[in-house]
Curated annotation (Swiss-Prot):
Residues involved in (2R,3E)-phycocyanobilin binding: C81
Protein name: Allophycocyanin subunit alpha-B
Disulfide feature: none
Recorded name of the encoding gene: apcD
Assigned protein family: Belongs to the phycobiliprotein family.
Gene3D superfamilies: Phycocyanins (1.10.490.20)
Pfam families per the UniProt record, alphabetical: Phycobilisome (PF00502)
Post-translational modification: Contains one covalently linked phycocyanobilin chromophore. The chromophore is added by phycocyanobilin lyase CpcS 1.
Spans traversing the lipid bilayer: none
Quaternary organization: Heterohexamer of two alpha chains, one alpha-B chain and three beta chains.
Statement: the UniProt record of this protein carries the keyword Transport: yes
Natural source organism: Nostoc sp. (strain PCC 7120 / SAG 25.82 / UTEX 2576)
Annotated function: Light-harvesting photosynthetic bile pigment-protein from the phycobiliprotein complex. Allophycocyanin has a maximum absorption at approximately 654 nanometers.
């Protein structure tokens, strides 16, 4: 839920107008809007490049994943892994756009460890995959934009760890 929605709901629950502190938090949120949309646009426009680079980094670091017996061995398994990279990147853009982890949490992070465990996917491998996705993504952003986007990647990494 965005800062604006939170402030409105809380003020309404308490039958009052938003406080000056709440209005400041809305103002701060709006001031970062251009940056957040710029980050999302860059990530969305470069999804294919980011996913390719993240995949390359992961396979170089962990060739055992694509070797016989590895979780990404074979065309089908590899395609599923690549699909997940795109899915997580999209999920991160939702969080960046909202300026909040709630979309990440609600749409895709709750129960992720259990899901991967039930599918036999090693969660530490997924953490490595998200780290590769983070590096490939942040490398395309300015240092200021990378600093703003990094916590959303870190949230997913932490939730999986």
């Amino acid at each position: 839920m965005t800062v604006i929605s939170q402030v409105i709901l809380q003020a309404d629950d308490e039958l009052r107008y938003p406080s000056s502190g709440e209005l400041k938090s809305i103002s701060d949120f709006l001031q970062t809007g251009v940056q957040r949309t710029r980050i999302v646009a860059t990530l969305a426009e470069n999804e294919k490049k980011i996913v390719q680079e993240a995949t390359k980094q992961l396979w170089q670091k962990r060739p055992d994943f694509i070797a016989p017996g590895g979780n990404a061995y074979g065309e089908r398994q590899r395609a599923l892994c690549i699909r997940d990279f795109g899915w997580y990147l999209r999920l991160i853009t939702y969080g960046v756009l909202a300026g909040d982890i709630e979309p990440i949490e609600k749409i895709g992070i709750i129960g992720v460890r259990e899901m991967y465990n039930s599918l036999g996917v090693p969660v530490p491998g997924m953490v490595e995959a998200i780290n590769s996705l983070k590096k490939a993504s942040l490398d395309l952003l300015s240092s200021e934009d990378a600093a703003a986007a990094a916590p959303y990647f870190d949230y997913i990494i932490q939730a999986m760890s």
